[in-house]
Amino acid sequence: MSKTHLTEQKFSDFALHPQVVEALEKKGFYNCTPIQALALPLTLAGRDVAGQAQTGTGKTMAFLTSTFHYLLSHPAIDDRKVNQPRALIMAPTRELAVQIHADAEPLAQATGLKLGLAYGGDGYDKQLKVLESGVDILIGTTGRLIDYAKQNHINLGAIQVVVLDEADRMYDLGFIKDIRWLFRRVPPAAQRLNMLFSATLSYRVRELAFEQMNNAEYVEVEPEQKTGHRIKEELFYPSNEEKMRLLQTLIEEEWPDRAIIFANTKHRCEDIWGHLAADGHRVGLLTGDVAQKKRLRILDEFTRGDLDILVATDVAARGLHIPAVTHVFNYDLPDDCEDYVHRIGRTGRAGASGHSISLACEEYALNLPAIESYIGHSIPVSKYNPEALMNDLPKPLRLTRSRPGNGPRRAGAPRNRRRSG
């Protein structure tokens, strides 16, 4: 991590459990990010925390560190059963739950606390087998958690820590009833440590904190601008007819090491994937229609660098931490202003720089004024020469439900294409 992303506060300065500090330092984490430096003094004192911080600033490690410390420092209830986890971490998406689990594994290995994972889509029996052996920390999405609870595979009566991650996204996805169902089955707020983290702390999120937490302390890390000063933003105004050719020309010019392209619909994403795959790019597709095993495989391949480009709907815009994303392309300007911030927040993370390129086409240009008002600044406009756009493009591939979601490997040097300034 860049030093500009960290504070002078060290994890070892806190009265954290020694095993937690050792695990953090083994992973190279010595200094706290701002949200960690604000939250840890409160959680270590047993205070509930509702935290807001910009995407990529260390929210996950803030609540994981607090959770592991609390469980190591407080005994479980005397009559705890094997199907009773001690901590519950709720996430809005399968991908985020899997990611939190991966981030927690080094801490689990160092401390001996057992992790469980519960998410819908697949793996029901495999997940259940782990739960039946007994877990200390259960991470999951609300639907699968409720499913296991209703069938008495898990009992939430011994919960000592509750974490709600990406709370605003929970509302957006309509999970608030599920959250309240789960909260009704854990011990009262005063008998547990509660943490809520979100990129935004809207009125409805604060209302949820008031309902379900014990006099939570609000901590906020607000950047000077919502989009982060390390992200270079750029905007083009293509016609609908030139939009795809402009995207492909920009990709050839930028030749990004690792890029995410966002579009507003799954059908648009499939179309983009088809054009890029036909042109020889190593590209993966991530939409709600992609099967769960394939989604995880595509994310893993993208994270490892086996794929250079990921085309995604906003299902991937929240919570995913994929290191070293150099470019984000907004093929469509999002209808929701917050989604613009979350999309481009995939790059410029953990002190790195990033580049966001947005295409304001005839269909979605009307979204731009609200986005610029929300982020508090105008997005710099760049021009292009229509005559310089790529025009020797192969016929796009068409996705069938049986074919893989990946394109061929990209090989060779980029075409010698340049846009005019």
Curated annotation (Swiss-Prot):
Keyword Cell membrane: no
Motif (DEAD box): 165-168
Annotated Gene3D superfamilies: P-loop containing nucleotide triphosphate hydrolases (3.40.50.300)
Location of the Helicase ATP-binding domain: 40-219
Alphabetically ordered keywords of this record: ATP-binding, Cytoplasm, Helicase, Hydrolase, Nucleotide-binding, RNA-binding
Main subcellular localisation: cytoplasm
Composition skew (Low complexity), residue ranges: 402-414
Binding-site positions, ATP: A53, Q54, T55, G56, T57, G58, K59, T60
InterPro entries according to UniProt: DEAD/DEAH_box_helicase_dom, DEAD_box_RNA_helicase, Helicase_ATP-bd, Helicase_C-like, P-loop_NTPase, RNA-helicase_DEAD-box_CS, RNA_helicase_ATP-dep_RhlB, RNA_helicase_DEAD_Q_motif
HAMAP family on file: DEAD_helicase_RhlB
Function: DEAD-box RNA helicase involved in RNA degradation. Has RNA-dependent ATPase activity and unwinds double-stranded RNA.
Protein name, per record: ATP-dependent RNA helicase RhlB
